[in-house]
């Protein structure tokens, strides 16, 4: 499986100037190549390279390999756009978003990331330095900082290109690593995981990961955003963007911790992980006006992604099951009714009297559905006589 390792660069002022000039030149060249691809409706990388290669080198001061990387970046951007249109991510054929996306060439920000392959970038992991091509010449002994685990991953699994990124006044390199996947084991049982807003995750083992602190953190950021939005200045706009990224990083960190704990328990006990199939839930449920921001910021899909990739690295099977009525069905007598859940937190079966936390009951139902689904999937096909 492919993973990325992000290391922080520690450049000197002279190196910063060279990196900034290189990033600006590459993205200006990408803007030019994007206009050519749009005006001539070019889809092939080889065809666009024939049209733009010499102009990109001469007009923007790029060497041969960076010019090739710029052309590939443009072609990949248009390929991604066409895939998004086919998937319906930009709406129907004449929708405003789709018409806007198709009516102009793709633009590249001055500080957009730029890929470098091994001909333009070399790593010296023991010295924790890199050597990178710039428009001012080769910059050597560019120091970087990373954890020992990241260094081990880079040394063992780094492959392909790395991206140069500038974000929030800091420089980063994002390296692609091809990590081998262990074989998925046969689960002895399953851990059901119910995802929610008040409780971000609740397992059938009674482990509860509450979301109150994350909600308070989001409300605090919302108040700060409102104060900055009133000012309507450029500095306020910059601070708003920084705060948005900080809030997203915090939510990602919380999801990483939850996923790590759940996968560790599953790997240690030899069990699989069962999750609800929640794709499209925002289209099916229309919340009240004062609940829309809370539901829109609910990071349930990101938590599913984190659990899935961490489970793949550990060889733990992951199964998605039907989410309907998991918190309204009694796991003992299978009686299903909305009245079985009188409050958000409490479940009480009207038929057999089983009572308990509603999220735990939902997690147990998810676990039971995974047991049945896994048995059906692994039943051998009948032999033809």
Where are these regions (language model features)?
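Nucleic-acid substrate recognition interfaces
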Residues: 1-385
């Amino acid at each position: 499986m492919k993973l990325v390792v992000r290391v922080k660069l520690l450049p000197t002022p002279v190196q910063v100037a060279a990196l900034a000039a290189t990033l600006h030149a590459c993205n200006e060249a990408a803007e030019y190549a994007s206009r050519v691809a749009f005006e001539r409706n070019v889809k092939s990388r080889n065809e666009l390279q024939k049209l733009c290669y010499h102009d990109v080198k001469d007009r923007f001061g790029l060497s041969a390999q960076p010019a090739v990387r710029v052309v590939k970046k443009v072609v990949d951007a248009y390929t991604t756009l066409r895939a998004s249109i086919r998937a319906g991510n930009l709406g129907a054929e004449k929708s405003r978003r789709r018409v806007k996306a198709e009516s102009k060439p793709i633009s590249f920000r001055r500080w957009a990331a730029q890929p470098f392959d091994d001909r333009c970038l070399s790593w010296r992991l023991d010295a924790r330095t890199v050597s990178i091509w710039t428009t001012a010449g080769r910059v050597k002994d560019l120091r970087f900082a990373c954890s020992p685990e990241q260094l081990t991953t880079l040394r063992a699994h780094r492959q392909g290109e790395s991206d140069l990124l500038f974000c929030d006044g800091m420089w980063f390199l994002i390296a692609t690593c091809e990590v081998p996947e262990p074989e998925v084991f046969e689960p002895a049982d399953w851990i059901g995981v119910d995802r929610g807003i008040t409780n971000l995750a609740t397992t059938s083992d009674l482990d509860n990961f509450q979301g109150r602190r994350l909600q308070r953190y989001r409300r605090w950021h919302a108040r700060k955003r409102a104060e900055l939005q009133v000012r309507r200045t450029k500095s306020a706009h910059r601070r708003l963007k920084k705060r948005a990224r900080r809030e997203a990083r915090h939510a990602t960190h919380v999801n990483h911790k939850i996923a790590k704990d759940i996968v560790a328990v599953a790997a240690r006990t030899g069990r699989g992980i069962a999750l609800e199939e929640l794709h499209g839930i925002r289209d099916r449920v229309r919340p009240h006006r004062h609940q829309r921001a809370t539901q829109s910021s609910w990071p349930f899909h990101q938590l599913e992604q984190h659990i899935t990739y961490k489970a793949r690295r550990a060889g733990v099977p992951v199964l998605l099951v039907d989410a309907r009525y998991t918190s309204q069905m009694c796991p003992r007598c299978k009686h299903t009714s909305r009245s079985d859940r009188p409050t958000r937190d409490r479940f009480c079966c009207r038929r057999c009297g089983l009572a308990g936390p509603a999220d735990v009951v939902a997690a147990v139902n998810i676990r039971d559905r995974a047991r049945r689904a896994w048995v059906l999937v692994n039943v051998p096909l009948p032999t033809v006589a």
